Structure formats: structure tokens, C-alpha cells
Amino acid sequence: MSSALLDEAARIARQFDYPAAEVQRGVTEYIREIDEGLSKEHTTLSQIPTYVTAVPNGTEKGLYLAVDLGGTNFRVCSIDLHGDTTFSLTQSKIMIPRETMASGTAKDLFLFLARQIESFLRIHHNDHFEAHLRRRNEKNGNCEEDLFDLGFTFSFPVRQLGINKGTLIRWTKGFNIPDAVGKDVCALLQNAIDDLGLPVRVAALVNDTVGTLMARSYTSPGETGTFLGAIFGTGTNGAYVEKLDRITKLQTIEHSEYDKTTGEMIINAEWGSFDNHLSVLPNTIYDQQLDADSNNPGIQMFEKRVSGMFLGEILRRVMLDMQRNESLGFLRAGGASTVSVPQESSLYRQWGIDTSLLSLVEADKTENMEQIKVALKDHLKIERPTTDDCKAIQTVVHAIGKRAARLSAVPLAAILLSTGKLQKDDLVDIGVDGSLVEFYPNFEGYMRDALREVPEVGEAGNKKIRIGISKDGSGVGAALIALVASKEETRRKSQ
């Protein structure tokens, strides 16, 4: 019986193979979508101009604020950049009341956020705050220079129109405040800040992936600025430095203001939607079922094969499939006719398997799979799985995780080739963040294997690529974008 189970696990695992020829097809299609996304709006790959036109080099100094609205918590932090690639960070996190998220008005939400900024300043920067108030109350007191510049990480779909201007396209993640849709979220926050008389200027609207790139560029060693930032975690996305003259759609976007002197701009790729039409992406029966049952069928197709939120769901569907085939004896406590999984196990709940389980399963090197047995009990309440059950699960997990890592190489290789970066530079620095790339065993190794298999990258190109973890794009990254934005504002005023 056990050999039938292991044979079936191997058969399913083979469906997740993603060979070199497929990687190459993916890269070719991604390059086509880059060109399309740079030339016009409403394309599969959004290629959003961020209006951030410079990356830091580690010498930047100053005290900046950053706030992060991306889910149920609102984070406020101050970042002191020391000018030597180091920084210190102070932060507080506040849970957003459900009624403010869903039944309030835009004014209610943004006033709530501004009040959190006020209490943070009073606790952590009271001297500065009080000095500002004193100066403002003096006759003709000009306190422009006392203002804190703030980077606003807003992790919802936004149409960005400038470095500190962007209109909300739609809410996600449980938020529903209809009167904010179509409004400039930076202006909404600034108005609430001004109503409270706070010494704060909303200097930049920040995407967390762009923040990842900026944070890496500030903290990474050496002369080379960071070229690309990528997130491989619950979701996946990338941002990279593009030549301004290639972003031809900028000419059609009205009212956009930005610094043209650097000749470059960071592009937010929004690569989760790469190849939504499935011309090149692998598409097993499990991918098809996951997509059909998701809340956005036909959308974010690349993300659904790569990011942590979905890998656990692919595994869950494979496990249920194997369990339904009684002849395999899978999870049947060593051949018993009853299943050894209680009804309340999250195995039976959509999205019930977290990626952390896959990381634990992949990492187990023990002969009897002891770590997997413990993990199955902890995560899924599965009692007494056999060693063969665990081996079958590990075989499938390995295939799902390896495919995700190899797919992750596609946008990296395509962007490197499309920009000619590998030909021009001896070193290309990439900052990455997210639970997969940080904790999934050998994720970067599998990704690099696939990069090497792209002929124009090869071993020589792979050696030029330096990948480093970049933490806290929504904190230090947002502060750095606020810094770039305030420099640009000063430059514009002096013209």
C-alpha cells in the first residue's frame, strides 16, 4: 500500500515540474508584457510609474516619519537616518476599530489615523512638537522647516499621479469606505493632520515593494545602488529602476510632476498579474480548482502559483485528493479504514494551511520524519500520521515550493534582460523581503538554478547578481522616499 502512495505522490509532484524551456518561455512573455506596460495604461502588467527618481546611497541623514496602512493594524514610526547606512527606528502599532474600517466615512478613518500620529509625536518627539507649536504661535512664525516629512505606505490599489498624490481605485482586505474611492489619499491624510494642527507634511505615497528597494539601497554595502526590490511572502511583487525614456506612457498621464534630471524612475511592476491569460504559466488541475474557488478568478495568476497565501492551498487540495483515494491508505492511521484527521482540522477549510507548514515539511531531514509528524499535529490536528504519509506530503511540498521559486526567477531574469543591466554592470543588487524567500529552505537556491538556465543570464550573469534580505520597506523605505520627495520639493521651489 505504501509504495502505491509514494508512487502517487511522485506522479502528482511531476505535474509541478517547471523545466528550463518553460522558464525561457516565461521570460520571453514577461519581456513582451514589460514593453506593453511601459507604453500604455490598463495592461496585464501594470508597470506603474512611482515618480521616485533616485535611490539612496547610504549617506542620507535626518529624522522622518512613516505610517503604514495595509490591514487591520496602523503603524506609526519615526526613523533617524544616521548617514552611514544605519538607522534607528521607534514605532507603535494600533488596531483599527472594525466600525472605522467598514461603516465610517473617509473623514472618520483619516482623522483616526491623524490622532494616532499626534499621540505618537507627543510620546516620542514632544520637544520638537512643543517647539513647533510655540513658533507657530509667534507673530509671522514660519515653521516650514520644522515640519516632519512623512512617507505614507498605503497597501491598497491606487492610481499614482505624483510622488505624494494618488487616488484610491478600490478597497480590499475588509475595508469598505465608499466615499474615499476616487479621492487622493495623501490629501485626505494631510487634511486630517492639518485639522489637528500637527507639524507633519505628507511627502510621499509609498508602495511597500518600492520601499523594500529603497531600504536595501540605503543599507546595502558598496558603491552600487539597488536595482530591484522584490517581495516573496503572503503576496508577491517587484519594483525596479527603469530609464525614463522607455516609460513612454508618462507622456499621456496628465498632471504628473517629477524630477527628470536623473533620467530614471522606479517602476512598480505589480507582477502578481503576469500572464493572467495563461499563455505560458503552468496550470495543473489544482491551480485551476484554486483559481475557480478564489474571490478573484482569472486575476493575479502569477501570484497564485508563487506566493505563500496560495502554496498552502495548493498543498491542501492535493492532500484531500490523495485522501479521497481510499486504496492509498493516506492519513488512515496505518491502514485503518477510518481517517485519522478530525473534522475540525483546518485541512477541511479553504486557506487552512499556512506556508509555514510547507517550510517545516521541506526542512525535515530525519529518517522517520519526526518533525513533519509534530508539524501535522500542531497545524492540522492530524494524529499518528505514518512515515509514508509524511514522505508523500514532503514529496508534494518539495514540488510545489520548487516550482514557486523557479517561477520567481522569471520576472527577475526578464527585467535584467529588458533593461540590459547584466551587460552594463559588474554587480546587480537585489533586495528581497517576505516569509518565503526568508524562511523556505533553499528558495533562493532554486531561484538561482532557474536564472542560470536562462541562456542570456547563465553562470556568468548569475555571479553578478547579489541578493540580500531587505527588512521593513514600509518603515525605513517609506522614510527614504519621503526624503527623496522633500529634496525634490525644495529643488522645485528654488527654480
Curated annotation (Swiss-Prot):
Region span, Hexokinase large subdomain: 207-472
Record field: catalytic activity: D-glucose + ATP = D-glucose 6-phosphate + ADP + H(+); a D-hexose + ATP = a D-hexose 6-phosphate + ADP + H(+); D-mannose + ATP = D-mannose 6-phosphate + ADP + H(+); D-glucosamine + ATP = D-glucosamine 6-phosphate + ADP + H(+)
Record key words, sorted: ATP-binding, Glycolysis, Kinase, Nucleotide-binding, Transferase
UniProt-listed Enzyme Commission number(s): 2.7.1.2, 2.7.1.1
Gene Ontology terms: biological process: glucose metabolic process; glycolytic process; intracellular glucose homeostasis
Residues reported in the UniProt entry to bind ATP: 93, 472-477
Region (Glucose-binding): 149-175
Pfam family, one: Hexokinase_2
Annotated ranges, domain Hexokinase: 3-483
Gene Ontology MF terms: ATP binding; D-glucose binding; fructokinase activity; glucokinase activity; glucosamine kinase activity; mannokinase activity
Any one cellular-component term (Gene Ontology): cytosol
Activity dependence on pH, as recorded: Activity is relatively constant from pH 7.5 to 9.0. Below pH 7.5, activity decreases with pH.
Region (Hexokinase small subdomain): 57-206
Similarity-based family: Belongs to the hexokinase family.
Function per UniProt: The enzyme has great affinity for glucose. Mannose, 2-deoxyglucose and glucosamine can serve as substrates.
Subunit structure, as described in the record: Monomer.
PANTHER family found in the cross-reference section: GLUCOKINASE-1-RELATED (PTHR19443:SF30), HEXOKINASE (PTHR19443)
Protein name (record): Glucokinase
Native organism: Aspergillus niger
Top-level taxonomy: Eukaryota, Fungi, Dikarya, Ascomycota, Pezizomycotina
